[in-house]
Amino acid sequence: MIELGVFLATPNLSDAEKQRISSWVDALSNHDTLHGPNEHYVAISYHISLFISRRCGNDRLFEMIRSMSRQTLRYSHLALRDTVRRDTSRKLWKNLSDFLAVRDAANASKIARELVDASGKSARMYLASSNQT
């Protein structure tokens, strides 16, 4: 769902909005954000995701994305608890921002899907390992 939101939002983003997204993505690289507790990193990622999705031009789709994002926020915290995983996420966000900058909706939406898939996989691995102890 998020990839559709990103795909539809890409042509709607103004230069100023793309710059704001880029600055938030840069904030993900901040040492304290990347290597400290994951709450700040997750909050920025969540904000970027909803900011982009809001520009999709479809209020119903945005509401579905927002609802799904709220429901999976706990799993995002689990998935991004590790600094190595946050660094991988940061690189994907940087790629997504770069594709948004040149209005490449296909690749931006592909990266959005990778972000969701990677977080889901990481959360599932964490939950599986915590159930074995």
Residue spans of the language-model regions?
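Conserved amphipathic alpha-helical segments that form helical-bundle/coiled-coil interaction surfaces
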Residues: 14-78, 89-97, 102, 107-118
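Active-site loop of classical SDR/Rossmann-like NAD(P)-dependent oxidoreductases
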Residues: 85-87
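Short alpha-helical functional segments enriched in proximate histidine and acidic residues
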Residues: 4, 8, 51, 122
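Short, charge-rich amphipathic alpha-helical segments embedded
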Residues: 115-132
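Conserved segment of winged-helix/HTH DNA-binding domains
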Residues: 1-17
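A glycine- and Lys/Arg-enriched "phosphate-lid" helix/loop adjacent to the NTP-binding pocket
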Residues: 82
